[in-house]
Amino acid sequence: DIIKTVMELRARGVEFLSPPPHAYYEDIPKRLGKHMSMMKEDLNVIEKLAIMVDADEDGYLLQIFTKPVEDRPTLFFEIIQRMGAKGFGAGNFKALFESIEREQAKRGTL
């Protein structure tokens, strides 16, 4: 359960990459297409927790990435929950890249 996991990790001090913009979450129904009817998770909660959503022909997935865990921004963890999807969230690549860039800008390492 990615929602409970992310909430617990945040409570324990784990920091995640900054969330995609609100427009990202507005586009989720379009990205999920036929899989939107399968989605049980509340989109408001997904957005509040900054969890990203993607789909492939087999289903959808939920994923989030921690901030880098070392001084060099090269190691981070991914939390992923697959709901039939077999891919790796390729549709989230741009959102992930932009989030990493925002974090680097905050750190002054862009």
Residues covered by each model-derived region:
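Glyoxalase I/VOC metalloenzyme domain signal
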Residues: 1-110
